């Protein structure tokens, strides 16, 4: 018999406003503010209404120092948001190689998958990110992996019309 969901505590307006300022700190890259709050006991894996963690917001918006700060306080680098996306997939989508390097340095699985089975390599291929495709493959990403629908990185590049990564992946997989 399925268990009933746990009740969600009601939060007052002041608490909700404070939480939004915390998420804004991650979005804007305010690593000093994040560090202060984390040092006071704020959970490193705090998530907003969309399931975006502090790390997801910092990494998606390209704030490496803020991401490094949150990771230093134990943030889970593979925590998915409610859409099933990971920080690594977000960085691949945005084309942020330095963020990808940081996440991999902190133990992110290069083959980690989003809820739909897409890997960061597939995201990079879809959006014509040749430098990131090369880097991820060099770090062990499988260019023949398939997502939940059976699409490979090459198929994803074809579907999105990403000509450079199509050519790159054709050279790699034959």
Roles of regions detected by a PLM:
Residues 1-22, 106, 138-139, 148-151, ...:
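Ankyrin-repeat-protein effector appendages
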Residues 17-39:
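Alpha-helical segment of the N-proximal tetratricopeptide repeat
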Residues 24-29, 57-63, 90-96, 123-129, ...:
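Ankyrin repeat A-helix N-terminal signature
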Residues 35-43, 68-76, 101-109, 135-142, ...:
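Ankyrin repeat domain, specifically the short helix-to-loop turn at the C-terminus of the second helix
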Residues 46-47, 77-80, 110-113, 145-146:
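Ankyrin repeat boundary signal
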Residues 60, 82-105, 111:
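Alpha-helical adaptor scaffolds
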